[in-house]
């Protein structure tokens, strides 16, 4: 997918780029698959900020995505490729013979007119097909992977993401995650074949603050620009560096410090991600 750049007729346009939208074929979305989401802007039920640098952003409707792929053994046709304001991947509208319509994540290479199918048994290995991990050959790249059977896909759902099946052991399948982490997933879990499309999203340059505001991202103030009461890096006459290692506003080391708590599922992780 091509990335479009602009002539630098303003300073912000100089570095701004957008994705070419020629792959989007739909003029409008299916009304029955749209719903409203309450915008919290990073506030909890008391109205207090619990997640900083968030706001409502542009008005948008949520597209209901079929992450479970549980319409088994019925072949559907891809009727349209659509833009989804809530995710960086494109979505595909699948129409089934009984008139049912569902959105799925568009894998790279899936286009209008293609057929997709989901099954609990084995299928041909084609882009967009969904089946249980135990029926997918070793070496295949997959996306939209379940962590618990029937719960719906939770892993490798972002643009350009995929995991690779590396092997099997007892009731588990070994997957190499996008982070290079190796872990066990139950072989009864469903996954879709292929890589999530819109791979060039990572190369887009935001270019100007206004685009981030539309996305619901507020400006981020440096700790060194604050007062000592607001941040450990604050205070000092003029511009001063930090004493010691960089930390968060609450004193947690900011770079490389592990904050993940121990979980029962740690035993399913074979090796953690490799740092580049």
Swiss-Prot record:
Start-end of Basic residues biased regions: 257-276
Molecular function as annotated in GO: rRNA binding; structural constituent of ribosome; transferase activity
Keywords (A to Z) from UniProt: Ribonucleoprotein, Ribosomal protein, RNA-binding, rRNA-binding
SMART domains in the record: Ribosomal_L2 (SM01383), Ribosomal_L2_C (SM01382)
Pfam family, one: Ribosomal_L2
Record GO cellular component, one term: large ribosomal subunit
Region described as Disordered: spans on this chain: 212-276
Any one of the GO BP annotations: cytoplasmic translation
InterPro entries: NA-bd_OB-fold (IPR012340), Rib_uL2_dom2 (IPR014722), Ribosomal_uL2 (IPR002171), Ribosomal_uL2_bac/org-type (IPR005880), Ribosomal_uL2_C (IPR022669), Ribosomal_uL2_CS (IPR022671), Ribosomal_uL2_dom3 (IPR014726), Ribosomal_uL2_RNA-bd_dom (IPR022666)
Function: One of the primary rRNA binding proteins. Required for association of the 30S and 50S subunits to form the 70S ribosome, for tRNA binding and peptide bond formation. It has been suggested to have peptidyltransferase activity; this is somewhat controversial. Makes several contacts with the 16S rRNA in the 70S ribosome.
Subunit structure comment from the entry: Part of the 50S ribosomal subunit. Forms a bridge to the 30S subunit in the 70S ribosome.
Family: Belongs to the universal ribosomal protein uL2 family.
Name used for this protein in its record: Large ribosomal subunit protein uL2
Organism whose genome encodes this protein: Helicobacter pylori (strain G27)
């Amino acid at each position: 997918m091509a990335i479009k750049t602009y002539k630098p007729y303003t300073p912000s346009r100089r570095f701004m780029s957008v994705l070419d939208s020629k792959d989007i074929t739909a003029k409008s979305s299916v009304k029955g698959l749209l719903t409203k989401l309450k915008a919290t802007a990073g506030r909890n039920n008391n109205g207090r900020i619990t997640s900083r640098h968030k706001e409502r952003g542009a008005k948008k409707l949520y597209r209901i995505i079929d992450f479970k792929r549980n319409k088994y053994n019925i072949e559907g046709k891809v009727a349209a490729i659509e833009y989804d304001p809530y995710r960086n991947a494109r979505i595909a509208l699948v129409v089934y013979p009984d008139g049912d319509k569902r959105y799925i994540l568009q894998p790279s290479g899936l286009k209008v007119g293609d057929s997709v199918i989901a099954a609990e048994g084995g299928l041909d290995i084609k882009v967009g097909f969904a089946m249980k991990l135990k029926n997918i050959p070793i070496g295949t790249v997959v996306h939209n992977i379940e962590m618990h059977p029937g719960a719906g896909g939770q892993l490798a759902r972002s643009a350009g993401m995929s995991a690779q099946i590396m092997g099997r052991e007892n009731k588990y399948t070994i997957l190499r995650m996008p982070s290079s982490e190796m872990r066990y997933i139950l072989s009864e879990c469903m996954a879709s074949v292929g890589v999530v499309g819109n791979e060039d999203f990572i190369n887009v340059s935001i270019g100007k603050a206004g685009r981030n505001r539309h996305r619901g991202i507020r400006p981020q103030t440096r700790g060194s620009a604050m007062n000592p009461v607001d941040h450990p890096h604050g205070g000092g006459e003029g511009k001063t560096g930090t004493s010691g290692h960089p930390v968060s506003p609450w004193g947690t080391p900011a770079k490389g410090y592990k904050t993940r708590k121990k979980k029962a599922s740690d035993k399913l992780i074979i090796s953690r991600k490799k740092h580049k």
